[in-house]
Amino acid sequence: MSKLPRHIGAVLSALRLNGGRAEELGSLDDATWHALLAYTDSTHLTLYLAARARDFAPGWVRQRLAKNLSDNSRRFERIKAAYGEMAYAFRKAGVNHVVLKGFSQWPDYSEDLRLRLQSDIDFYCPPESIFQARDLLIGLGYKEVPTNSFADHLPIMIREGGWQWKGNYYDPDIPPMVELHHRLWNRERLRFGPSSLESFWSRRQVRRVEGIDFPALHWVDNLGFSALQVLRDLVNHGLLLHKVYELARFLDRNVDNKHFWQQWIELHDGPLRQWQAIAFRLAVQYFACDVAPQVADHIKQLPGFIEKWIVHSADSFLNPLENLTKDALWLHLALIDSAREKIAVGLRVLIPMKLQTDPEMVAITDDGTVSQPAFFQRLLRRAAYGTSRLPLHARLLPVTLWHGLRLWWSAREFKAQA
């Protein structure tokens, strides 16, 4: 378990759903507050922190948070308007879809959607509808930008305009992006998890939020999808902390919801519930949420190695810039059944052969258009970016192997004592 910087510890303490100590924020100096706000901006927790702890912040921080909230409220109105335009086009053309994440997380995951930083609108469309949906968005003025080939969605789409980045995460003028998902889980890439989530689509339902009617996942399936998103991000070394906080909030609010948890057991099979339980355990670790007895039972049934991994390694993901690690590999391998696939994933992570893409290869230019370098320039930049990361991979290799050995030994002792 890694020692956290003071500003990160203060954030977690303030956001704990049981036994939180928001008053600790009152003892922070300005330099620590600057570090804290940079951290909560990047983890999408700033507005959740403002709702729970703004009274303990100094005046300049309260002013900053008030502006962030005002900007994000205006941004949410823009998101609603953009969705309304898309939904009308989809409905008129008979394009089937469900809304994922975003405003579909109200009310159990996010008590106020104006506290949730939403940068894009996510849809899931079945194969027969997804390209029609894309073409309709192009007709509305959206343009595709390059996306990781392993993404679960088509290339991200964004409407061109005169917006420029000004360093404000909550800028109401940021044009909403759109992701058209063609799958809810990428077993081919991850080598574990559900082989099919078609039942999620068949159980979809219409919901209403602030005057918006939209198709969404069934409540139980939305929990499953949210938990799987956390697990996916975790093994992909890219955990987004606000997703864990929202999951913790759902668990805490539904401790006594016996009907919901009975449905959860009836609709999701044992392996699917156990994969979700890993994300639930992480939510307890980070945000001290209460859980229903059914959830507690599934957490207790997690293998000893996974429990030890969460205890020893999970906190490093709270401070990824300082704790560069590939420890997620050991959790990932523990979830894969096939020895052959374990080796494939291990080699992919420890000795990456494919050069990564420079994250700055796509930009919105001064006139608002989406641009990308020419092919040869992209090739050179990709090679330079990937090569520049080779020393990092070499440095992390022995550390990762040592951490894996330590985890294996700790889990072995745990099993012997059980």
Model-based region annotation:
Residues 1-119, 125-418:
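Conserved NTP-donor binding/palm subdomain of two-metal-ion nucleotidyltransferases/polymerases, i.e.
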